[in-house]
Regions:
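Extended repeat-based interaction scaffolds and adjacent low-complexity, acidic/S/T/P-biased segments
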Residues: 288-289
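Glycoside hydrolase catalytic-domain groove-lining segments
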Residues: 67-90
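Chitinase-like catalytic core of GlcNAc-active glycosidases
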Residues: 1-70
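Short carbohydrate-recognition loop motifs
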Residues: 243-280
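Acidic (Asp/Glu)-rich catalytic clusters
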Residues: 50, 75-81, 104-106
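Substrate-binding cleft of secreted/luminal carbohydrate-active enzymes
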Residues: 85-245
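Structural preference for beta-strand elements that scaffold enzyme active sites
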Residues: 18-22, 57-59, 82-88, 110-112
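Extracytoplasmic/secreted cell-surface and envelope-processing proteins
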Residues: 30-35, 66-72, 95-100, 120-125
Length: 289
């Protein structure tokens, strides 16, 4: 199987295709079960064999903390990119607690969340504000922002790195440093024109040019817009986080198209809100509206 993966990769590259394999690293070179959480000579053939890359992602089992550094070093030693090793987090069973985040700060390694075969675990933990549709959605959006941007929901104001956060409660997540501590923003926005109306893909009504065309609840991820890269990167003119920073979020009470819109509220002296990371080739003839 290892040789098959390598051959598929080589052939795909020869015809301009991409071939990707993501592998949960609980097997030995020979194929027997090995639940150890380190990467070494007994497992190396699943990532790198005969000086060829075998899989694109090799996720370490969840107790990788004590061996993270040696696993990354061994990957480099055999010629592999250490960032093809992924530190696994079992967020279904342990939320964000099982692996030591502090270890990853100085380790060349990527991060993988294992959740559930059928359910987004952030959504699964989003009943804290109530069980109604709007309450669950509001909680889900906030927890998304805490997971990725940190407990303050602003990547420019991340809490210190903290291990052992086993609860998904708002209070516990207020102390989480966020994935932004480790992962710089990337962008799929490559070309103009670019249009977003901040539609989440659901709503209490459906609007077109601001007018209600369907008066009932709905959802359709196919009409979800591109949503902000950063939620919410807010600074003043000195790149400091303002004490009176504007509040940002989404509202279902109004929309230009679909079911939601960007909502900003509060009184602020200066709040610069960065929304999207882009790779546009902008010219003097382009317009922003």
């Amino acid at each position: 199987l290892q040789d098959f993966f390598s051959q598929c990769r080589e052939y795909a590259e020869s015809i301009g295709w991409q071939f990707h394999v993501y592998w949960y690293g609980v097997g030995s070179n020979g194929g027997s079960m090995d639940l150890g959480s380190s990467f070494g000579s007994s497992k190396q053939d699943w990532l790198w064999k005969n000086n060829k890359q075998v899989v694109d992602m090799y996720m370490l089992n969840y107790d990788w903390g004590y061996s993270a550094s040696s696993s990354a070093s061994y990957a480099e030693q055999i010629g592999a990119n250490p960032y093809t090793l992924y530190a696994g987090y079992d967020i279904q069973g342990n939320w964000l607690a099982r692996g030591p985040w502090s270890t990853l700060k100085n380790t060349k390694m990527s991060i993988a969340f294992w959740g559930n075969h059928t359910t987004n675990m952030i959504y699964q933990n989003s009943s804290e504000f109530g069980s109604g549709d709007e309450a669950v959605q509001a909680c889900y959006l906030e927890k998304q922002e805490q997971v990725f941007s940190g407990g303050n929901r602003n990547p420019a104001k991340r809490p210190a790195i903290k291990d052992g956060i086993s609860s998904s409660s708002e209070a516990a997540m207020n102390n989480f440093h966020g994935i932004a501590e480790y992962l710089p923003a990337r962008s799929v926005l490559q070309e103009l024109p670019f249009v977003t109306r901040f539609g989440l893909g659901n709503g209490k009504t459906f609007r077109n040019e601001g007018k209600v065309t369907f008066g009932n609840k709905w959802f359709n991820v196919g009409v979800q817009d591109y949503l902000p890269t950063w939620r919410w990167w807010i600074t003043d003119d000195s790149n400091n986080v303002p004490e009176d920073g504007i509040e940002c979020g989404f509202t279902y009470e109004d929309a230009w198209y679909a079911g939601s819109a960007l909502h900003m509220s509060g009184a602020t002296k200066v709040s610069n809100v960065r929304l999207f990371k882009t790779n546009f080739d902008v010219s003097e003839t382009d317009d922003v509206s």
